[in-house]
């Protein structure tokens, strides 16, 4: 995971890490974690912080060493990327930019992708993703659909 980071990112994370490693022992406490991540432009919730700590704090001692920290930051960045990708994909479908994907827009994109769909198939796809029943897909519904694949 951390091997996907550039040298520049690693040295940036090392710098931030050492700012909060007050006693220089190579570990930071879980309480300091939120401050470190925010200094790097991330904005984790308390719940996310707790989950990340639980995932990487192998010995459960409540502190995180630098390799654990790198793994965690790489994960966080990967998740952010996929969010951006979903936003971009939504824009491709939402031709008129009104925040909704209509049946016509869905049919148009699917046809361009080489998928010849009947009206019934398009309506079925809309129905499956259309949580609020308004006959079109909004961004939240699109995200749910993409993440449930």
Curated annotation (Swiss-Prot):
One of its GO terms (molecular function) is calcium ion binding. The modification N-acetylalanine is found at residue 2. Ca(2+) 4 binds at residues 130, 132, 134, 136, 141. Ca(2+) 1 binds at residues 21, 23, 25, 27, 32. The keyword Cytoplasm does not apply. Keywords: Acetylation, Calcium, Metal-binding, Repeat. Ca(2+) 2 binds at residues 57, 59, 61, 63, 68. It comes from Paxillus involutus. It holds the Pfam family EF-hand_7. This is Calmodulin. Ca(2+) 3 binds at residues 94, 96, 98, 100, 105. Belongs to the calmodulin family. The keyword Metal-binding applies. Calmodulin mediates the control of a large number of enzymes, ion channels and other proteins by Ca(2+). Among the enzymes to be stimulated by the calmodulin-Ca(2+) complex are a number of protein kinases and phosphatases. Residues 8-43, 44-79, 81-116, 117-149 form the EF-hand domain. Gene3D superfamilies: EF-hand (1.10.238.10). SUPFAM superfamilies: EF-hand. One of its GO terms (cellular component) is myosin II complex. This protein has four functional calcium-binding sites.
């Amino acid at each position: 995971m951390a091997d996907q980071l550039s040298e520049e990112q690693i040295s940036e994370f090392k710098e931030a890490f050492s700012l909060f490693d007050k006693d220089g022992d190579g570990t930071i406490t879980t309480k300091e974690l939120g401050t470190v991540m925010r200094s790097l432009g991330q904005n984790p919730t308390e719940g996310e912080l707790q989950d990340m700590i639980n995932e990487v704090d192998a010995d459960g001692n409540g502190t995180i060493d630098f390799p654990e920290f790198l793994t965690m930051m790489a994960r966080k960045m990967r998740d952010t990327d996929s969010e951006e990708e979903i936003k971009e994909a939504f824009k491709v479908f939402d031709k008129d930019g009104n925040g909704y994907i209509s049946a016509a827009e869905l049919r148009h994109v699917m046809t361009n992708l080489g998928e010849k769909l009947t009206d019934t198939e398009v309506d079925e796809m809309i129905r499956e993703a259309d949580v609020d029943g308004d006959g079109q897909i909004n961004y939240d519904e699109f995200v749910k659909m993409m993440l449930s694949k």
